[in-house]
A protein has these predicted regions:
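N-terminal capping/small domains of soluble enzymes
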Residues: 16-80
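Active-site loop segments of alpha/beta catalytic cores
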Residues: 1-28, 33-35, 52-56, 85-318
Length: 318
């Protein structure tokens, strides 16, 4: 199997010649101003780590540039939210840059583009405190704003897949920490816009992955995502305390993860031999199918790329 064949088969939950590997880091800010340099950085990361496919970063676009959000103070103002539109630089810029990355990676590389859920897009612009203030002040206003963002995200999803050539999206859903919302609040306030984008993405591609993000280090209320469907689920093995076989059974599909992404943990400190042994153990625990070896979330800048390559090479021997 070549890399594309291996990853495509893994997304279908079928047996591969070996377990695919994909871990990722963000692109440093000094590369953001030049799309060619940004693309080259991601292509070199693919080559240096020898992973089986690439999760494409959305760095530089972790915001939502709605003029209304710049000075938002009251929740009712969210009813004035307007779409950016398909020609807005925030949408077009991501599509055009992704074209360059996909072209540089070549036809053998499956690529998934990072897309944040609507509420996270708003939060990235205004911050957690204001997000929580507004949604508790008037949940319906925030739901409306999220629905507007969702329509723009559909334009982005279609563009990065059909125009830029990405195979699918890496859809990051967040904000389900056990101390943030009750299950009822999340399902009422957040789920509609989450699923609007997810369902649309699944209508465009059968190569999407859902990322149940635990970047904040707090356990997620996983029950609120039980009806979120995609061929692959990326989950937090350590924060959400769910091992590989348990995740396969819980999510009912191919699962992606395994290593703790946080600084100072095993992948950052272990010897090459220890990493090779742990790679083999995780693959064994997976049963050898319906598994992609990765990390809980984005790896930090201080992790040398050669450590990811150790995992890639070890997976081929396991």
């Amino acid at each position: 199997m070549n890399k594309r064949e291996r990853v495509t088969v893994a997304f279908r939950g079928q047996e591969t010649d070996h377990i695919p590997v994909c871990m990722w880091k963000h692109v440093p800010s000094e590369y953001w101003a030049d799309d060619d340099r940004f693309a080259d950085y991601q292509v070199r990361a693919f080559q240096n780590t020898d992973v089986d496919f690439m999760k494409l970063s959305g760095d530089k676009y972790f915001c939502w540039p709605s003029p209304l959000l710049e000075h938002i103070g009251k929740a009712d103002e969210l009813f004035g939210m307007e779409p950016l539109g398909r020609m807005h630089p925030h949408i077009r810029g991501q599509i055009e840059r992704t074209k360059k990355v996909v072209r540089g990676l070549g036809k053998d590389c499956v690529s998934l583009y990072l897309v944040f859920a609507p509420l996270s897009c708003i939060r990235l612009q205004i911050g957690y405190p204001m997000m929580m203030k507004l949604i508790r002040e008037n949940p319906e206003a925030m739901k409306y704003a999220c629905s507007v963002v969702a329509e723009d995200l559909k334009l982005l999803v279609r563009g990065v897949i059909e125009e830029a050539g990405a195979d699918g999206i890496f859809y990051s859903v967040q904000n389900a920490e056990i101390d943030r919302f009750t299950a009822e609040e999340y399902r009422d306030w957040v789920t509609p816009s989450d699923k609007a984008v997810l369902d649309f993405a699944n209508s465009v591609s059968d190569m999407n992955a859902i990322h149940f993000c635990a970047w904040e280090g707090v356990r997620n209320r996983l029950s609120v995502w039980e009806d979120y469907r995609a061929p692959v689920v990326s989950w937090s093995r350590f924060i959400d305390e769910m091992d590989i076989r348990e995740a396969q059974e819980h999510f009912g599909c191919t699962v992606w993860g395994g290593f703790d992404n946080r600084p100072g943990t095993f992948l950052y400190t272990a010897t090459r031999e220890e990493i090779e042994q742990e790679t083999a153990r995780m693959i064994s625990r997976s049963g050898g199918t319906r598994y992609i070896l990765g990390s809980d979330c984005s790896l930090h800048d201080e992790l040398p790329e050669e450590r990811i390559r150790w995992v890639s090479e070890a997976a081929r021997k396991a």
